[in-house]
Amino acid sequence: TPDATLPVNSIVTPNGSSSIVEGGTTAGTNWFHSFDRFNLPTGSTVLFDNAATIQNIFSRVTGNSISNIDGLIRANGTANLFLLNPNGILFGNNAQRDLGGSFFASTADRIMFADGGQFSTLGAGETPDAPLLSITAPIGLQFNRGNAGIIQANGSQLSVPKGQTLALIGGEIHLNRANGDRISPIAQLWAPSGRIDLIALWEGEWGLDGTLLQSPLTPDRPP
């Protein structure tokens, strides 16, 4: 369900068990979406219908519920997809990706950009940051609250194309069997000739290049 926090708001058009995400706010080669809730029921499909020029798709959840993903997420071309929900993200047994780029799922509070811009999930007391949406590349994720949500994959089979990154970055990362028993397969992750990041971070900043930028146990980053 889209919210109304962007200059151009997201539009979700349902068609049977499928949905198409359009609208959103474009800044250079970045495409921003904002949702009050983001869930994908079993057997359903959502397509982020991006233009061929888009390199990064950013989607955030500003409401208070976790995201339950148990269907197929698609995007066009080689765009990277970022899903940000500080409440938590649950990937079910039927969760799949059909992406040409990398996939980042995180319970961080905000995405940081090279020019100092941020894409925040609008925590308590914050104001919408839509006018500051950046045209530059994303460089990291920031955890401010000290109680980041959990990312859980229950028998999921998550993959990205050759040479891309599959990243799950949250307060805790749980890779479980589909039914919680000893027979069902455990969650499986694939990134052939690429990179898989499983990062548990309650507070601090994590660089998208795979480095810790700042934590309560490290000094502040240099200016």
Annotate the PLM regions.
Residues 1-223:
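Extracellular and secretory-pathway beta-repeat/beta-biased strand scaffolds
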